[in-house]
Regions:
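Dinucleotide-binding Rossmann-like beta1-alpha1 core, especially the glycine-rich loop
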Residues: 50-130, 250-252, 280, 287, ...
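C-terminal catalytic lobe of FAD-dependent flavoproteins
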Residues: 294-381
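Helical element adjacent to the flavin cofactor pocket in flavoenzyme catalytic cores
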Residues: 143-193, 197-200
Length: 381
């Protein structure tokens, strides 16, 4: 079978992780191909999230990556990529009601401060000094002044555009269906179109779709597919610049520079989708978005008369231990993996892309360690 195209690196998945990795590899002079199964760049979770650039409440294994990104990469990203990614570093309030929420937030604070992050607990009055629009029912919050948010779609497209300018070749509508070994090494990617792509290294960064694809070479990443809801409101006068979240993690969001609010969250209503779909209704609009909206109003009643402009849902690749896999498994030479980001990959995307470029091109990440993200952590004991 004739090879359609070949490069040093073939990346499967044109989300923010894949595009960032492609950019940093091309910046070092590598030839790179990126394959995207849909016709739209960033069609998965990369364009369907709340845009949080969050250090607080991170798993300790991820915290060094996002702290590095916030300190060294996010501040200059718009200038570097030549496109405004709307990065705003105005802090993050994780809100709570009552003692149970306070205990959750205090535990998250203690875990983060132990690694050097500036995050602290506030009482209800202190919270409303920062954001006076919040409900009086808010009794506490964690506050990280160096957290923030950015525009996920613009960030994904900025990496895409900058990578193209460096010579990266993007192929849309090329759904990867299998990985093919040659002489004991992974060498080829076949697609649903019948095309064949060749690379010295294949980086699988296709979200939940990575699991089935990796099965073709005997690798299994324990992931689940979890639906996330996102809603966008009409524009309102400027109210606040912080990123918001909650102790029970039922929603997160922020106000954009344009005035609209972007919120996201996991409603857990998927088991009921079939009932609504059978009645000819859009399950996202009929049940999931209203559930998310009610959660938001419990904390933010000032938005009760604000109209929703649109809603959408997208799936995330939830890894078994809630942190991603970024590795080169020894049992499949030529393979690199970047998946399982569990809905919080956007904030670490610049650091992940940089480290993946080092992993692929040098054999090991050098800026920061990726040892905590190895595939073999799931091996039987």
């Amino acid at each position: 079978m004739a090879v359609t195209d070949k490069a040093e690196v073939v990346i499967i998945g044109s989300g923010v992780i894949g595009n960032a990795a492609a950019y940093y590899m091309a910046k070092r002079g590598a030839s790179v191909i990126v394959l995207e199964g849909s016709e739209i760049i960033g069609n998965g979770g990369s364009s369907r999230n709340g845009g949080g650039v969050r250090q607080s409440a991170r798993d300790p294994r991820e915290l060094p990556l996002v702290m590095y990104a916030v300190e060294n990469l996010w501040p200059g990203l718009s200038d570097e990529l030549g496109m405004d990614v709307e990065y705003c570093k105005k802090g993050n309030l994780r809100l709570g009601k009552g003692e149970a929420h306070r205990k959750i937030l205090q535990g998250l604070c203690d875990r983060s401060t132990a690694q050097g992050l500036d995050v602290r607990m506030l009482d209800g009055d202190e919270v409303r000094e920062i954001n006076p629009y919040l409900s009086d029912e808010v009794t506490c919050a964690s506050w990280c002044p160096t957290d923030g948010h950015a525009n996920p779609l613009r960030t994904t497209l900025a990496y895409y555009r900058a990578a193209r300018q460096l010579g990266v070749r993007f192929y849309t509508r090329e759904l990867a269906t299998g990985l093919i070994m040659d002489k004991g090494r992974l060498r080829y990617v076949k697609t649903a179109c019948g095309d064949l792509f060749e690379g010295d290294t294949i980086l699988v960064a296709a979200g939940y779709a990575s699991r089935a694809l990796l099965h073709t070479v005997g690798i299994d990443i324990p992931m689940n597919k979890v639906l996330l809801e996102a809603i966008v409101t009409e524009a309102e006068p400027p109210m606040f610049e912080q990123m918001l979240g909650t102790a029970p993690a039922d929603f997160y969001g922020h106000q954009t520079p344009h005035g609209s609010f972007v919120f996201g969250g996991h409603t857990g209503m998927e088991p009921y989708f079939g009932e609504y779909a059978s009645d000819g209704l859009n399950p996202s609009q009929a049940i999931s978005a209203p559930t998310a909206a009610r959660a938001i109003l419990n904390f933010f009643p000032r938005l009760q008369n604000t109209k929703l402009v649109r809603t959408w849902a997208g799936s995330m690749d939830e890894c078994a231990d809630k942190v991603p896999v970024m590795d080169r498994p020894a049992e499949v030479p030529g393979l690199s993996i970047a998946c399982g980001f569990t809905g919080h990959g956007f904030g670490i995307a610049p650091a992940a892309g940089l480290l993946l470029s080092e992993l692929v091109l040098d054999g090991k990440a050098s800026t920061l360690s990726l040892e905590e993200f190895r595939y073999d952590r799931f091996a039987p004991v």
